[in-house]
């Protein structure tokens, strides 16, 4: 839709923004309660809508193309979130893992989620996870 999505997660300030690709002007910016992350966001055009999926150490989140939070959940991610999400088979996949951290969660998420999608326990599931 003519914009570049930038995620800036660090210890001082974290946010996601949409930048107009033609003018370089910021279209919108949404604050994020996150620490550092190395994952690249995924623009996921699914059967219901287009979402910006962003994993994080605190919460995994999805935003609209205007920066509105669509869904989120605590994925109990590893020390550093490095893998970028990807889409396949009608779902988006979020994973986490880092050298020396044995905790490496993975999630498959179906389209249409809203609000808090938190599963029960580490092996739990919801209608969208």
Predicted segments, located by residue:
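Noncatalytic, solvent-exposed loop/strand surfaces
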Residues: 1-129
């Amino acid at each position: 839709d003519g914009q570049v999505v930038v995620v800036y997660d660090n210890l001082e300030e974290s946010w996601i923004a949409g930048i107009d690709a033609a003018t370089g002007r910021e279209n919108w910016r949404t604050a994020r309660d996150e620490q550092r992350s190395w994952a690249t966001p995924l623009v996921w055009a699914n059967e219901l809508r287009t979402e910006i999926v962003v994993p994080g150490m605190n919460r995994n989140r999805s935003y609209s193309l205007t920066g509105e939070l669509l869904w989120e959940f605590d994925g109990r991610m590893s020390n550093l979130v490095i893998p970028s999400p990807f889409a396949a088979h009608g779902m988006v996949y979020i994973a986490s893992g880092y050298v020396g951290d044995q905790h490496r969660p993975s999630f498959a998420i179906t389209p249409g989620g809203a609000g808090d999608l938190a599963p029960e326990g580490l092996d739990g599931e919801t209608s969208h996870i």
